[in-house]
Amino acid sequence: MRLAVTGKNGQIALALKAQARPDVEILTLGRPNFDLACRSTVASSIRDAAPDIIVSLAAYTAVDKAESEPYEAFAVNRDGVQALAEAAAGLGVPVIHLSTDYVFDGAKPVPYCEEDRTGPISVYGRSKLEGEFAVASANPNHTILRTSWVYSRYGQNFVKKMLRLADTNDELNVVADQLGCPTSADDISVAVMTIARRMLSSSSADLRGIFHLSGSGEASWAAFAKYVFSVYDEITGRQIKVHDISAAEYPTPARRPANSRLHCDKLERTFGIRLPNWEESTRRLVWALLLEGKDA
């Protein structure tokens, strides 16, 4: 199986490369030779890669910065993704596209299903939703995976930020009134491989469309931080106090949904995939980062 993976330096792309089996060839695409904001590079890069399937991970992910750079966000998350999906369709290649929980407004009191009405409240969320529309219209042979609160040993993410802050702080204020599903990039990569194999082995329409893919369980940012620091305490013997605060007490340029929990039963029914509990995957990562030094 030959995968072309965009966003070569992102968390999920790096996790895919790290976990690839010998029978899987992963071609990672990224700047400067491949840039979603430059449509002219997209089609030629995909044609040269000659993949069996494309995993679309590249995105403009600076949620707050997008509020002042909407053109740049839409150029990548909508227009670039459309060019990618069109190129794939021209070659008869299926696309797995990663989207986000931020396509929802957060007003629903329970986890969101795939069929629920979207209503993004940030430029980033709107650009990602438009990207979903672009993929669906350009290439019917697609699977869109909405995920959330991604963390890993790679790049910048919440777990690594908390551990960095622990170096110089004994107490931290963390938002407690936003709920979501922390999701390990390693777990996502395993799921993506399974989905790719199924898509290549079957043309069933049931395997196409939108699916929610997130870690089992739920947490607020504060609860997430407290769990990270509970594992940190086990390893180091040092306690970090987390104080719950409201989102209003921690203003940011972009609004975040108060609830972006994702209901993932459709994914399990269709592909037999249910990701591990987020606490299990978080514990494994914190131990790796602190004891094994597997940082990137």
Swiss-Prot record:
Pathway(s) annotated for this protein in UniProt: Carbohydrate biosynthesis; dTDP-L-rhamnose biosynthesis
List positions binding dTDP-beta-L-rhamnose. T100, D101, W149
Q: What does this protein do?
A: Involved in the biosynthesis of the dTDP-L-rhamnose which is an important component of lipopolysaccharide (LPS). Catalyzes the reduction of dTDP-6-deoxy-L-lyxo-4-hexulose to yield dTDP-L-rhamnose. RmlD uses NADH and NADPH nearly equally well.
Subunit structure and binding partners? Homodimer.
**How is the cofactor bound, in the record's words?**
Binds 1 Mg(2+) ion per monomer.
- Cofactor section: Mg(2+)
- Indicate yes or no for the key word Disulfide bond: no
Please list the residues that make up the active site: Y124 (proton donor/acceptor)
Q: Give a GO biological-process term.
A: dTDP-rhamnose biosynthetic process
What is an example of a GO molecular function annotated in this UniProt entry?
dTDP-4-dehydrorhamnose reductase activity
Segment forming the signal sequence: none
Source taxon at top rank = Bacteria
The site feature described as Could provide a fine-tuning to achieve optimal pKa matching between active site and substrate is recorded at T100
Q: Return the broad EC class.
A: oxidoreductase
This enzyme catalyses:
dTDP-beta-L-rhamnose + NADP(+) = dTDP-4-dehydro-beta-L-rhamnose + NADPH + H(+)
Q: Which UniProt keywords apply?
A: Carbohydrate metabolism, Magnesium, Metal-binding, NAD, NADP, Oxidoreductase, Plasmid
Q: What is its EC number?
A: 1.1.1.133
Keyword NADP assigned to the entry: answer is yes
The record's section on InterPro entries has: dTDP_dehydrorham_reduct, NAD(P)-bd_dom_sf, RmlD-like-bd
Which residues bind NADPH per the record? Q11, I12, D35, L36, A59, Y60, T61, Y124, K128
Per the record, the similarity remark reads: Belongs to the dTDP-4-dehydrorhamnose reductase family.
Residues that coordinate or bind NADH: G10, Q11, I12, D35, L36, A59, Y60, T61, Y124, K128
Q: What is this protein called?
A: dTDP-4-dehydrorhamnose reductase
